[in-house]
Amino acid sequence: MTATLERRESASLWERFCSWITSTENRLYIGWFGVLMIPTLLTATTVFIIAFIAAPPVDIDGIREPVAGSLLYGNNIITGAVIPSSASIGIHFYPIWEAASLDEWLYNGGPYQLIVDHFLLGVCGWIGREWEFSYRLGMRPWISVAFTAPVAAASAVFLVYPIGQGSFSDGMPLGISGTFNFMLVFQAEHNILMHPFHQLGVAGVFGGSLFSAMHGSLVTSSLIRETTENESANYGYKFGQEEETYNIVAAHGYFGRLIFQYASFNNSRALHFFLGLWPVVGIWFTALGIMTMAFNLNGFNFNQSVVDSQGRVINTWADILNRANLGIEVMHERNAHNFPLDLASGESLPVALTAPAVIG
């Protein structure tokens, strides 16, 4: 008998890199989308931390009145933010090399664009990485589909809305109070509370929280006990077991009698599909609503007040909401314009003496 020994060809450095990148045995899966995700998210995180701590004031309104957002310039964790790019930049791409100097780039809010652009690329890479990992494990792709909802929401407030409004200065500041300021101004300018897509988003988020709490409490209340009374019920289960952990029939029967029969699910797959679908679709609609309002397709405006036969105003909640919107609009960007256009366009009325009808 003759034994033939062949010399094993060593894989090239590129082949070994490809094998390592796509291996599902790594402690953290990287994948080809991870090659995009990791550097972009690291860049966004690093620049955000530096800018939040030490960035100089930014001329956000383009009127040579810089606004300080960093900790070293007098802010705290609540008031601090990375200030959006200047209105003088508009929606132009503004990398470091487009500025005459680093000081000019910082003064015009360049870090905001750098952070937002890298962050959006990074979270898109995260979606792709979730799909890629699921594909290599033979799983279905719904995890990545669900994550498109928060990515759509982030894209709406950081990219689509500024483009629609004509300037990245209208984007959401990267900070706690800056986020609240963005929400208030958005309400004043677009009446988002009266937009049906935002209302669907509220139903999605609050409904998803309710359904999650209901499902979790029903499951933990109907566990199938595999241990004695002297042992913890947790010892009766192991990860990946074939047997069911809880009794869905008991949970279904309880909930069906608590509310009514058809309010509960008797199919586990349908139940969990619904639990995933409800909040995701709600957030999709919210993101779509932000994108439509970016181009000034706003929420419902009931601008014509209800009046009686004598012409006197009958105050409704719509009147209160309109007044609140006008008040917020007067307060924001107070130095950028002398008076909001929708207040300056009508005839001057003695507001302190009468309650005028709000006419759009």
From Swiss-Prot:
The keyword Lyase does not apply. It is a multi-pass membrane protein. Chlorophyll a ChlzD1 binds at residue 118. Pheophytin a binds at residue 126. Residues 345-360 form a propeptide. One of its GO terms (cellular component) is photosystem II. Gene3D superfamilies: Photosystem II protein D1-like. The lineage of its organism: Eukaryota, Cryptophyceae, Pyrenomonadales, Geminigeraceae, Guillardia. A quinone binds at residues 215, 264-265. Signal peptide: none annotated. GO terms for biological process: photosynthetic electron transport in photosystem II; response to herbicide. It comes from the Eukaryota. Its EC number is 1.10.3.9. The chain crosses the membrane at residues 29-46, 118-133, 142-156, 197-218, 274-288. It holds the Pfam family Photo_RC. It comes from Guillardia theta. The D1/D2 heterodimer binds P680, chlorophylls that are the primary electron donor of PSII, and subsequent electron acceptors. It shares a non-heme iron and each subunit binds pheophytin, quinone, additional chlorophylls, carotenoids and lipids. D1 provides most of the ligands for the Mn4-Ca-O5 cluster of the oxygen-evolving complex (OEC). There is also a Cl(-1) ion associated with D1 and D2, which is required for oxygen evolution. The PSII complex binds additional chlorophylls, carotenoids and specific lipids. This is Photosystem II protein D1. Photosystem II (PSII) is a light-driven water:plastoquinone oxidoreductase that uses light energy to abstract electrons from H(2)O, generating O(2) and a proton gradient subsequently used for ATP formation. It consists of a core antenna complex that captures photons, and an electron transfer chain that converts photonic excitation into a charge separation. The D1/D2 (PsbA/PsbD) reaction center heterodimer binds P680, the primary electron donor of PSII as well as several subsequent electron acceptors. It catalyses: 2 a plastoquinone + 4 hnu + 2 H2O = 2 a plastoquinol + O2. It is an enzyme of class 1 (oxidoreductase). Tyr-161 forms a radical intermediate that is referred to as redox-active TyrZ, YZ or Y-Z. Keywords: Calcium, Chlorophyll, Chloroplast, Chromophore, Electron transport, Herbicide resistance, Iron, Magnesium, Manganese, Membrane, Metal-binding, Oxidoreductase, Photosynthesis, Photosystem II, Plastid, Thylakoid, Transmembrane, Transmembrane helix, Transport. The record marks 344-345 as: Cleavage. The record marks 190 as: Stabilizes free radical intermediate. The record marks 161 as: Tyrosine radical intermediate. PANTHER family: PHOTOSYSTEM II D2 PROTEIN, PHOTOSYSTEM II PROTEIN D1.
